[in-house]
Amino acid sequence: MPLAFVVSSGAFAQSAGSNVVQFGWMHLAPQDSSDPLKIQGNTLRNSGASVNNQDTAGIALTHLFTDHIAVEGVVGIPPRVDVSGTGVLASPSINPVANARQWSPALLMKYYFTDADSKFRPSLGVGVSYIWFNHVHVNPAFERSLSGLVTSGATTAAPSNATVDSTWAPVFEAGLMYNFDKHWSVSASVSYLPFSTKAHITTTLPTGAQVHSEAKLAVNPIVTFLSMGYRF
């Protein structure tokens, strides 16, 4: 009986030196808010922006330094983020006003509770994420509307381009892993990334002069990650 117990308990061991790779589904749910759009420093009253929910595939690699302490790197396939106007910018004809690809790889330190040979292993983690955006595209309908705004209706043909600031964000995570055997497991985690960014829009007038607009957006997503893991 003692030998049988040892064999059984060791069948799920995730101990010091173990590596776990996980692949699964991520859902990003922004808890967003925004400041009004500013055009050349002038506030466009009752304007704002919001960000849609996103779904993507994610991968994580975890290395356990001890039976309980681990470091984890997490990255998702960058989802397409739609930004929609609110208030006076809420017209369906110009929305979403812009979209972009969001990159947000994260690095965390994690603490696993319970013994290394437990089937259920809850965990808490804290870390940092570097967030940046590329392939920023302005909706042509919004571009025409913005052109009319910045020229007081003189033209709707002034082209615009946009950029979004990169930023660092803290990451707070709670998770639970269930081990089927010494190799395979499933995990679920919920993370929170509080961060804000600014979008900058440059509109070029027919004269060649440029008009600068910007909007500050607090994104603050809650990220759910459901995954299958393999230990080696």
Where on the chain are the PLM-derived regions?
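Repeated loop/turn-to-beta-strand initiation elements of outer-membrane beta-barrel proteins
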Residues: 19, 68-71, 117, 184-186
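Extracellular/periplasm-exposed beta-strand and loop segments of Gram-negative cell-envelope proteins
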Residues: 29-55, 77-105, 113, 130-167, ...
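Outer-membrane beta-barrel channels and translocator barrels
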Residues: 16, 66, 78, 114-118, ...
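Transmembrane beta-strand segments of Gram-negative outer membrane beta-barrel proteins
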Residues: 15-29, 221
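Hydrophobic core residues within well-ordered beta-strands of beta-rich domains
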Residues: 19, 55-57, 69, 103-105, ...
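Bacterial N-terminal signal peptides
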Residues: 1-6
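Sec/Tat signal peptide C-region and signal peptidase I cleavage site
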Residues: 9-13
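Residues on the lipid-exposed face of transmembrane beta-strands in outer-membrane beta-barrel proteins
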Residues: 23, 59-63, 73, 107-111, ...
